[in-house]
């Protein structure tokens, strides 16, 4: 009996201690969670963790990285990196009448065209990029894909950090999360395709943010040998009169181009000349180059609108071309529209040496004037969005937040007043937020695949990029009514 009482007493004491410890732990936990900064930190970590998990869980799927991976493997084997001859073969069969456009949707012809186009120009980057990926090409595809996605994600976080520094929002986690949510469709699509865009954005931002000219040139040249579009940012160095940075960019570009010669000199030279001939001399000069439904660049949009052979699988099905013109006329239209877009940049931004606006415009140009701009390419809107969001955020801090703290009306009334106030005093911010929300809602899961197909064929994302470009120009001219005019100078 005594033993039983002792045992029961020990258990009771243990339970009391356990309950007491749990109570103290719960109180401490609640005190921490009541802290606003802790909530924000937990939410931010959870957001980026989910974003990373979403990407890494799909790393084993077929994606654009497979093209990089296969090209890297072919580099080690000495096999040709490029395979664009199908374009000439398809056009020859269409022009000779062997394949008739009106029979494009018959089962036999459709499957024939689909098989010919699936591997079409899968790798169009310079040989250096394939060479740089050789270390991870020795791993199985799934492992290599996960490594590349992780590097991409780290570059994405690095880009957000540089953005926070340039806009004096270091440690402002909510700003970064909102910026990501507004661009979530592009970020998610980029991860699903395991593309190289995040690395390019980081290299570009790091190059323009660094004060050392040799380091800026080194970083920008690396981005340039991966993809040509970062070459537009040489204009940023020119605007800032950083002529040494331009010189170092040129020198290091040559260094990166000839670096693979240490591994396979004759093969590197052969592939570099092949890339120049196939990509630069032939295909990128033609508006027909991969002008498919999902290609949202200016060049591809004009081809879809006015050239009958631009996207033979989708044009007739969706009511295109709108008007049949010759390729020469379409090229002329491209030149005219390019001038219309570029002149305001040089007149309003470049001449006035506004650093942030210039960067934002160049990121937009990297999408618009690229020969190929799939949905994932629009992650380049991250920086233009940051400029416009910073403006809207500052306006909200000055004019909206004090009202919310002082007013006791209902949530709906305060929200309606805030929208009216933004529209009345800062139309640039209002248009930016409205446009970003609209693009966010134009998702297949919301609007359906049929409507999304029609929007993609019309290149609605191209118009959204141009819309942001116009807002950047107006942001220079018009300041919010409640804020004094000032220059953004982060140098």
Each predicted region: which residue ranges?
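Start-transfer (signal-anchor) and selected internal transmembrane alpha helices
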Residues: 1-7, 12-55, 168, 470-491
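A cross-taxon signal for low-complexity, glycine/charged-rich
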Residues: 3-8, 14, 19, 23, ...
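Primarily membrane-embedded glycan-assembly and transfer machineries that use lipid-linked glycans
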Residues: 24-216, 243-358, 362-375
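Membrane-embedded alpha-helical segments of multi-pass membrane proteins
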Residues: 150-155, 195-203, 223-229, 250, ...
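Transmembrane alpha-helices and membrane-interface helical segments
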Residues: 158, 162, 202-213, 236-241, ...
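Membrane helix-loop boundary segments at the extracytoplasmic
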Residues: 189, 197, 369-381, 440-460
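Membrane-interface alpha helices of multi-pass inner-membrane proteins
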Residues: 215-238, 361-369
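Aromatic-enriched
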Residues: 387-398, 407-409, 413, 419-491
């Amino acid at each position: 009996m005594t033993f039983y009482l002792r045992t029961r007493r020990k258990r009771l004491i243990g339970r009391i201690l356990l309950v007491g410890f749990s109570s103290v732990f719960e109180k401490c936990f609640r005190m921490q969670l009541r802290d606003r900064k802790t909530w924000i930190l937990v939410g931010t970590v959870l957001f980026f963790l989910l974003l990373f998990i979403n990407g890494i869980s799909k790393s084993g799927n077929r994606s654009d990285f497979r093209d990089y991976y296969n090209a890297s493997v072919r580099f080690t084997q000495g096999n040709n990196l490029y395979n664009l001859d199908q374009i000439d073969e398809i056009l020859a069969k269409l022009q000779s009448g062997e394949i008739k456009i009106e029979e494009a949707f018959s089962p036999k012809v459709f499957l024939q065209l689909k098989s010919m186009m699936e591997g079409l120009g899968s790798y169009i980057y310079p040989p250096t990029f394939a060479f740089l990926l050789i270390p991870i090409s020795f791993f199985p595809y799934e492992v290599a894909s996960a490594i590349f996605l992780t590097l991409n994600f780290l570059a994405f976080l690095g880009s957000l950090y540089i953005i926070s520094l340039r806009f004096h929002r270091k440690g402002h986690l909510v700003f970064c999360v909102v910026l990501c949510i507004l661009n979530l469709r592009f970020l998610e699509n980029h991860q699903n395709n395991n593309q190289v865009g995040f690395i390019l954005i980081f290299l570009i931002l790091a190059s323009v943010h660094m004060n050392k000219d040799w380091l800026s040139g080194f970083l920008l040249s690396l981005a340039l040998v991966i993809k040509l579009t970062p070459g537009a940012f040489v204009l940023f160095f020119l605007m800032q009169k950083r002529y040494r940075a331009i010189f170092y960019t040129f020198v290091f570009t040559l260094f990166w181009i000839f670096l693979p010669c240490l591994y396979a000199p004759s093969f590197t030279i052969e592939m570099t000349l092949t890339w120049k001939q196939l990509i630069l001399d032939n295909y990128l000069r033609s508006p027909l180059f991969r002008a498919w439904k999902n290609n949202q660049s200016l060049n591809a949009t004009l081809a879809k609108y006015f050239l009958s052979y631009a996207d033979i699988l989708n044009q007739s099905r969706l009511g295109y071309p709108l008007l049949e013109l010759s390729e020469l006329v379409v090229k002329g239209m491209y030149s005219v529209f390019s001038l219309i877009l570029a002149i305001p940049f040089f007149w309003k931004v470049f001449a006035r040496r506004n650093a942030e606006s210039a960067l934002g415009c160049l990121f937009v140009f990297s999408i618009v004037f690229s020969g190929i701009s799939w949905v994932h390419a629009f992650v380049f809107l991250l920086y233009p969005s940051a400029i416009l969001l910073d403006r809207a955020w500052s306006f909200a801090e000055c004019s909206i937040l004090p009202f919310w703290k002082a007013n006791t009306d209902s949530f709906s009334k305060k929200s309606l007043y805030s929208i009216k106030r933004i529209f009345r005093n800062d139309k640039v911010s209002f248009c930016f937020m409205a446009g970003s929300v609209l693009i966010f809602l134009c998702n297949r899961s919301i609007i359906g695949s049929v409507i999304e197909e029609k929007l993609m064929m019309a290149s609605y994302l191209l118009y959204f990029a141009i819309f942001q470009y116009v807002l950047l120009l107006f942001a220079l001219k018009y300041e919010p009514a409640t804020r004094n005019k000032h220059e953004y100078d982060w140098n």
